[in-house]
């Protein structure tokens, strides 16, 4: 008998709690649409270091060549990426 009373009390508490949550969600208003926020990214590439840190809302304005202006044009990275200058991209240009 005690189990039935405890089960009924838990059931009533759960129903009351769910109604309170539903009412609070209705009063909080609609969720803002994120399509109104603009993010400008030139090119398809996003630096993995920035993406891993959760900084995906970075304005990328221009690109540079991997070899810091070597002009080979094969591998480009974003100008704001933290990639160190390691010479050209391996195509042999600038050696």
UniProtKB/Swiss-Prot annotation:
Annotated keywords: Repeat
Sequence repeats: 67-74, 85-92
Annotated region (2 X 8 AA approximate repeats), positions in chain: 67-92
Name the record gives this protein: Uncharacterized protein B0310.6
Lineage: Eukaryota, Metazoa, Ecdysozoa, Nematoda, Chromadorea
